[in-house]
Every structure is written in C-alpha cells, then in structure tokens.
C-alpha cells in the first residue's frame, strides 16, 4: 500500500529533470534525478513556472548557510499543479493550482498561529533547506498550511513571480512600512523586488522616487508608477533626493541589498522616517561591515525595519488586489526561458541582473 496519493501513477517513471550545482560557484547543470515523494503532511507540486531570483544566485555562491548538501537544486519561487499528497493532507487536492511562499511555516508555533509564518523558527525554504523548484517537480512540507490556491484568473508565470519578490515587497510596503497616501517613498534598486515595491507603493497613494544605476530599470520603474527617477551612477543620490523632497522621504526601501544602497536609503529619510530593509545583506558577502549609518538612525530617530517574505495566510489579500487589476505583476516579466537555459541564466547573474523578472518554464520545449 502506498503512503501517498498521486496523479498519473501508472505513467510515473520516477525520474525528473532538475538544475543542480555540485559545488558552490561551480557550473550548474541539468541532471536527471529521482522524482520526490510527499511526506505524510506534504505534497509534490508539478512545477509549471518558477522565478529566477538573486537569492538563488546568493545560494549558488555559498552565501546561505542553510544549503548544506551538494549537489543542490535551487529555486524558491514557483507555481504549479498538485501532483501527489501525503496521507495526512486534508485540504489540498491533486490537480489544485497552487503558489507557495518561499518560507514554509510549521503551522503550530506561536508565530505561525499569529499569522507570522514568515519568521517561523522551524521554517523550511525550498531551494535552501531542501531541493528547490528549478525542476519538473518539487516537494513541500505541511501542504495544508503552506500551499495557497492560485485563482484561475492568474496565470502560472505570474503566480511564479509572487512567492518571494512580489509577496515580500507587498508585505514590506503595506504592513511593515505601513505606507500611507501622500507619503514620499524612495525605492533603492529596481529589480524584481524594487519594481514590485514601486507598483505597490503607488497603489497605496504614495509618491515614489526610484533609484537605480540602470536606465532601463528606471524606465520600468516610471512605467510602474514612480514619479521621480534618479540614476545613481550619474547623479549624487543624496542631493538628488533632497532636490525632490528637501526634508527627506517618509519611507525608504533597500530592495537591492548592499552597504551602499542601505546607507543611501537611510540618509534619504526625514526625521523619524521609516527604513525597510528587504535586499539581502548576507555575512558571507559583506563580512562584519556596518551597512546602516547608526549615527543617522539615532540623531533622526529613524525606525529600521526588516521584512522577510509573507505568510501563506496573508496571500489572499494580495491575490485579490491582482485579480481586481489594482496590481499587475505580470508586467514585470521580461523573459521566459526553458529549464535547459536556466544554468546559463543563473551564471549570468554574476554580471548583474537583467531588468525585470525571468521566469523558467520546466515543461517548455527547447527552441
């Protein structure tokens, strides 16, 4: 007797294609490996679409201590169809369209019970704590708690852009930063998270200042609602922002993650402003160097706020905003590639990220 229920069991060869790296920083490659099986409370998802994110690059470079077993399958933003479920699963059904947050909570601790699974001490992250979604199938734990129903009105590629970047920006702007109508918001870094932050802040009624070194990224930010665009390579950012808002902005968001962007973001704030740090600053990358000018934080009584994903239970509000047309994350998708093309795309991130969001389609044919 099998311990799991699955679709197409008679046709299941038990093998799948997956991108793996065998050494940190070494060339990732497309391998054929065993297809995962669900745990008792888990599910296996057939990956229809998965996002390529800078966090995947950090993991590949060895910046994430949770990746302890090599070879490793990266990928943490995905949407797909439930292929198999464990014996204990009651809510999730085979064939369901789902999206999964990149932080999967335990579902029982005080943080999960209070709606804050994104900081669950026993959290599990696909692509970091275990095999990820750069594959034809991915397994997740505690499916009833972590799998979110994806409305049929939202395409899979759009759904794949939500689990990390868009959801993180949504919570960072709406809940953590508590952006209000009429406030000035400066967004540093207009990649996937930054562009989402621009769009979401604009939808909240804020006036957005976008900062990036790429003209193309700034053009996308303008198209997403930014009222002002500052080229950090050509302009003195501090002076340029004060030229827009002499007293400083109300909220700053570092969506990139570097000593330069986090410092500039804090300096851009008014007295008693709010800084939201979303971009990663891993110790393996920056060492012990201070990234926040604490004298400015103290002197201006600035609030420094971290934002780490969004719990599955909070997704319906964001999905409703997408269904209603208030938010349109699909406009950020700039490239769709096959699983065969994913290794080269991951390596190319060492030379910088292309503007917009890249989506990998594991079921797509080459060419």
Region spans (language model):
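A short acidic, Gly/Pro-enriched loop at the edge of an enzyme's catalytic core
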Residues: 240-252
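Glycine-rich phosphate-binding loop and adjacent beta-alpha segment
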Residues: 259-324, 361-367
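Glycine-rich beta-strand-centered segment in the early N-terminal region that forms part
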Residues: 36-50, 63-110, 151-153
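NAD(P)H dinucleotide-binding glycine-rich loop of Rossmann-like/cofactor-binding domains
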Residues: 106-188
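C-terminal hydrophobic helical "lid"/dimerization subdomain
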Residues: 2-16, 34, 263-266, 311-367
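Mid-domain Rossmann-like dinucleotide-binding core that forms the NAD(H)/NADP(H) cofactor-binding site
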Residues: 97-98, 154-234, 239, 298
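Residue-level marker of beta-strand positions
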Residues: 77, 96-97, 111, 137, ...
């Amino acid at each position: 007797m099998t311990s799991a229920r699955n679709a197409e069991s008679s046709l299941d060869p038990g093998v799948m294609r997956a991108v793996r790296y065998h050494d940190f920083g070494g060339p990732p490659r497309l391998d054929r490996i065993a297809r995962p099986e669900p745990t008792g409370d888990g599910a296996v998802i057939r990956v229809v679409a998965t996002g390529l994110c800078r966090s995947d690059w950090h993991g590949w470079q060895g910046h994430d201590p949770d990746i302890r077993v090599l070879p490793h399958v990266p990928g943490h933003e995905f949407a797909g169809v439930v292929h198999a479920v464990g014996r204990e699963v009651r809510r999730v059904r085979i064939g369901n369209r789902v999206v999964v947050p990149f932080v999967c909570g335990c579902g029982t601790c005080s943080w999960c019970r209070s709606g804050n699974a994104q900081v669950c001490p026993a959290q599990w992250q696909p692509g970091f704590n275990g095999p990820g979604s750069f594959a034809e199938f991915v397994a997740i734990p505690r499916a009833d708690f972590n799998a979110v129903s994806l409305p049929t009105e939202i395409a899979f590629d759009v759904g794949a852009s939500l689990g990390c970047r868009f959801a993180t920006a949504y919570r960072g702007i709406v809940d953590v930063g508590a952006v209000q109508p009429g406030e000035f918001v400066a967004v540093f870094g207009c990649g996937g998270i930054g562009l989402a932050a621009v769009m979401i802040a604009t939808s909240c009624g804020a006036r957005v200042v976008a900062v990036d070194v790429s003209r193309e990224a700034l053009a996308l930010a303008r198209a997403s609602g930014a009222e002002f665009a500052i080229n950090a390579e050509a302009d003195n950012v501090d002076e340029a922002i004060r030229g827009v808002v002499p007293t400083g902005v109300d909220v700053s968001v570092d969506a990139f993650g570097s000593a330069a962007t986090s410092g500039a973001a804090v300096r851009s704030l008014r007295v008693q402003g709010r800084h939201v740090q979303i971009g990663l600053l891993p110790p393996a990358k920056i060492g012990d160097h201070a990234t926040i000018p604490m004298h400015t934080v103290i002197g201006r009584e600035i609030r420094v706020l971290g934002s780490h994903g969004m719990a599955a239970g909070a997704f319906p509000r964001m999905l409703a905003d997408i269904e209603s047309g208030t938010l349109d994350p699909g406009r950020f998708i700039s490239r769709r590639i096959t699983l065969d093309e994913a290794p080269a795309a991951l390596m190319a991130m060492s030379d910088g990220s292309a503007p917009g969001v890249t989506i990998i389609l594991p079921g797509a044919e080459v060419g």
